[in-house]
Amino acid sequence: MRTAGRDPVPRRSPRWRRAVPLCETSAGRRVTQLRGDDLRRPATMKGKERSPVKAKRSRGGEDSTSRGERSKKLGGSGGSNGSSSGKTDSGGGSRRSLHLDKSSSRGGSREYDTGGGSSSSRLHSYSSPSTKNSSGGGESRSSSRGGGGESRSSGAASSAPGGGDGAEYKTLKISELGSQLSDEAVEDGLFHEFKRFGDVSVKISHLSGSGSGDERVAFVNFRRPEDARAAKHARGRLVLYDRPLKIEAVYVSRRRSRSPLDKDTYPPSASVVGASVGGHRHPPGGGGGQRSLSPGGAALGYRDYRLQQLALGRLPPPPPPPLPRDLERERDYPFYERVRPAYSLEPRVGAGAGAAPFREVDEISPEDDQRANRTLFLGNLDITVTESDLRRAFDRFGVITEVDIKRPSRGQTSTYGFLKFENLDMSHRAKLAMSGKIIIRNPIKIGYGKATPTTRLWVGGLGPWVPLAALAREFDRFGTIRTIDYRKGDSWAYIQYESLDAAHAAWTHMRGFPLGGPDRRLRVDFADTEHRYQQQYLQPLPLTHYELVTDAFGHRAPDPLRGARDRTPPLLYRDRDRDLYPDSDWVPPPPPVRERSTRTAATSVPAYEPLDSLDRRRDGWSLDRDRGDRDLPSSRDQPRKRRLPEESGGRHLDRSPESDRPRKRHCAPSPDRSPELSSSRDRYNSDNDRSSRLLLERPSPIRDRRGSLEKSQGDKRDRKNSASAERDRKHRTTAPTEGKSPLKKEDRSDGSAPSTSTASSKLKSPSQKQDGGTAPVASASPKLCLAWQGMLLLKNSNFPSNMHLLQGDLQVASSLLVEGSTGGKVAQLKITQRLRLDQPKLDEVTRRIKVAGPNGYAILLAVPGSSDSRSSSSSAASDTATSTQRPLRNLVSYLKQKQAAGVISLPVGGNKDKENTGVLHAFPPCEFSQQFLDSPAKALAKSEEDYLVMIIVRGFGFQIGVRYENKKRENLALTLL
């Protein structure tokens, strides 16, 4: 064993330190030989001192004679060890003591030149217990060697990154990036590779002092440790330009073991010290070849001694490894990178008090920040910055919808701007990455702008764990939902509300809502309303991008969904039907027998037969589905029972105007007066249980309709033919009278003849009405009847137009579109006020439609008319003579430019009867007016710039926040248009 007398052999000690584990196992011998080869490369000792080591290692344990001789020579100077207990034991003890002695002399001669004596004394004080124990024989020696092996293995385990198995990491370091791509290209590529694992940000850094030039590395920061772990395992072989990238984890506990302040405050444990020592023995890029150069690179006993002394706090902590300054900075703040302020750089370097503000800022996420929205405020911009500069700098973060740069006016020196993205995730990502970056010459400051409330919400933070039913269940608490655009698995969704108040309430309360767990919270922001739904109206045939609520959710809360379905335009109904029934191709099939026979008797050439039959079928299916969802056998008879009090002037508040849409398009006040609708009513009475069967088994709306028609075809054929013949006869007798004035039929008393002519007049086009009704009915516009024709006046301009009924009661339009003094028909409607298209005012119009009831409103479609339809009355002639005739699209363009609707008080000239009053609103094409249009109405309009939607509500002689027109400004605007 080792004593103080064996210090005089320090020159040969380096050779023996490498041979320590040779006496353990063959596997240990191989590993030690590899390490010895690595150690021989940087060693500075003489070649003649290394050659005996090679000979010893080649011979292994067979050269016992030479080892015995050496042990005898060295044992003479330290005979007081008590190691002379037999020849074999003496040889083994001498060999072990030589190993320890050589390591100690190596540490004293090479590593600690100035403090060799102190080091030697430490070794002696530590090795004396082992010397006493070694006199016991081979058992003690083997246990001592086993203990050394255990200490080595424990030290190796403690030197693993992160200091243990429980360490977490949220940051991945990507190195070996090469120099082919720019920093922005690398950052974009890494972001797109890792964004699928969770919320991520990427930072590119250049590390100086590593090799011949600066090394470029990337730090990928995740919000959750499990996301970083999944990304590291999934992206283990990332390739860039055919070069595999190196991915390393930056552990959270690695920084603590390296900080002197942390060691002073918290005494280091053995595992932390092991990580520190292991870190110094394995510097980056050095491998295992630098083991002998580290302070802890002594023998096994000395290493264990150092660990014990560090745990007790007697020795100062080891010096930190020579890391570059930039790398040290990056490891100080990788977790505060995403939301760092651009004007405060001190907290990036400091790890003490300076890091606390960053930790507080990092806590403010989009889920918690009430100011977070898709609009960014850009401050400290260069005075020469342009929109293209900002788009070029921010375009990589997402879709930019609007850029607004505010130039400094007189007395101001700062330039700022606003940048609007498509959603909150894009703006948040841009805010984190571009804060403090230099654009042209100035480092910009980025904050959130002011949110613009809309009725459409963007909801982020979703995933496969959020079903559509759960999303609808959580958001329908705040108001009626019109549509939800979401596919399960998407990361965000769009929710369209009916009112602005409901959307604002959901925006306020659902931000940060834990939908799917405490770590999966929602991000909510307002979104644009016009783009998505205009596409649905312009292209109705492709499949929609949202799913209908599942059956389970439909059974849970049918009432809110029914309310949303009543307010949804019919076109969206058809798209939802296609989602429910993907097996149907939705190609218009041959029309049913009832439709074909009716057309054959009433027309000569069925010009609009496919479109009309398809629209009738879809309208009937929408109505049947609404009734079937109520799950009541007698619900189909309920609308007919309501009609009796409605005809006598009663109004019902429990029916929304949209729910009566399919029935109200027929130009008759009551379905009882129409032979066609009477036959359909009889057909529904004949199979009374169809609603329950439709609810339980309905593979397709068209199939159900065909089945019911084929079932009752035989006993209803005669009734259909008689109804068609009677309608054709009534049409021939009453058409010339209606050609003179479409309103004279309303002056008669209630009877079957006027109502029949009303039902047949829905097949007349505007040109046929103006020509006296003598043209054939084949070119008629389907399901739209002419309710009024004349001039719309706005100051000194008149616009010929025709109005066709879309929804509601034709009697409302007939009774209010008259002269107040004489009661005769009115040929001109003069717009004197306008209503701003604000959401609260639009909600008020909708509320008044509901309050008025089915018999209290009428919705008309105004299209361009002919100048030949000008009335010959003296007052009309005088007004039109002093005004300039212009096309209707000029009026539409003016109202769209003003973002307003025209307002007309009815009847014209006032009326003493307060009960027979109303108001007309003329809406230009907008989201509010488009909900009342369907395919036949759009076919009649022919263009988005040539129609107005007229809403007449009875019983309201006052207006909602209207604004009187300025005559000079009005004339100038119309002249320019």
Swiss-Prot record:
Bias type Low complexity, positions: 119-130, 151-160, 866-884
Compartments in which it is found: Nucleus speckle; Nucleus, Nucleoplasm; Nucleus envelope; Nucleus membrane
CDD domains, sorted: RRM1_RBM15 (cd12553), RRM2_RBM15 (cd12555), RRM3_RBM15 (cd12557), SPOC_RBM15 (cd21549)
Ranges annotated as biased composition (Gly residues): 135-150
Site (Breakpoint for translocation to form RBM15-MKL1): R954, G955
Record keyword Nucleus present: yes
Disease tied to this entry: A chromosomal aberration involving RBM15 may be a cause of acute megakaryoblastic leukemia. Translocation t(1;22)(p13;q13) with MKL1. Although both reciprocal fusion transcripts are detected in acute megakaryoblastic leukemia (AMKL, FAB-M7), the RBM15-MKL1 chimeric protein has all the putative functional domains encoded by each gene and is the candidate oncogene.
The protein, known as: RNA-binding protein 15
Native organism: Homo sapiens
